[in-house]
Amino acid sequence: MKREPIFAFAQGSESREVVRKLYIGIAPVFVLAVNPNKEETEKLYNTELDEAPNYLSETEVGPEGNKSKVSQARIDFVVKSDPEKCNGIEMLTKVTFFLNKAYRYNKDNTKVEVINKYGETTWLPVGAAKGTEPIPDNMKWYDTSDMRPAYIGEAELTDFIKKYLNIPNKSFTNPKTKEVKFIPNLADAEARLDKIDNYFKGDFTELKNIIKLQPNNRVKGMFGVRTTDDNKQYQAVYTQKFLKLNVTDYSKLDEEMQNRKAAGAYPTTEFSIEPLHEYNVAATDFNSPENGPLGAGSAPTSTPWDAWSGNK
C-alpha cells in the first residue's frame, strides 16, 4: 500500500513583497513618545524586539588631527502625522536629535555657542561666555540671563521643543514702528533643558515630562526621502528648523533648507514644502535599522557648516 507523504508543516500563507510607504512635504505631527523603552516601542510599532533600544553611544568631536571621544545621547521623538490635516495620512516616524557631551566652538576655538534661559542661542568670545571679559558692544542685544555654554545639538533640540509647546519669544518687533516690545510675562518664554547631564546616563525623565505638558499639541516639520548610494530610500526629516502649528508661510523654511543644501548638506535627500503626500518609490530594504523602531546606530555624517567642538 502506497502511503501519502506526511508533512510536519502548516500550510503557511502567500508571500508578498512588503513595501513601506514614504512621505514628503510639510506635516503637523503629534509627539507620541520620546526614547521609548522596549515595551513602549513594541506597542507603538506593533512589533516585537529582541532587545531594548539603546540611546547611548560615543562619538568623536574636534578638528582633524585633534579629535576626542565624548558621550552621545540619541533623542528619538516618535511622531505621527495628524490625519485630519494630512488628507488622511497617518505617517508614523521619528524625529531624531543627537546630543554630544561637549560644547560647540568655532574652528579656532575663540568663540563658543551659548544658550540663555529663554532657549535663545548665539556665539560669544570664550572669555565673555566665562565672565572673565565684557560682552562685546555688538552683542549687547543678547540677553545673558542664566547663560551657559550649549551642548552640541542642544540648540536644535530646544527649538523643536519650543515649537511643540508653542512657547512665545520673549520679545517681538512692531512691523509698523519697528519698536521692540516684550511680552507681559517673561516667564512664559522660558525654555531651557536643565538636566542634560542625566541624558548621558540614560535618564530621559526631563524630556518625558516635557512632552506631557501639552499632549495634544502638534508641531510642523518638513519631511523628505533620503536615497543611499545603493539606491535604497528612507524616511527623513529636516531637523534644523520646525514650525509652530499656526504658521502657514513656509518660504523662510524652504530658503534655509535650500541654502544648507547649496552648502553641501542633505546631498541625497529630497524635501518639499507642499502638503504631506506619498512619495512614489520602488521597494527597499526595511530591515535596515534606520527604518526600524530601534533607529540608526550612529549619528548622521557631518556637514560643511558644523563647527568644531571641544570637550566639556
In which residue ranges do the predicted regions lie?
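Short beta-rich binding modules
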Residues: M1-K312
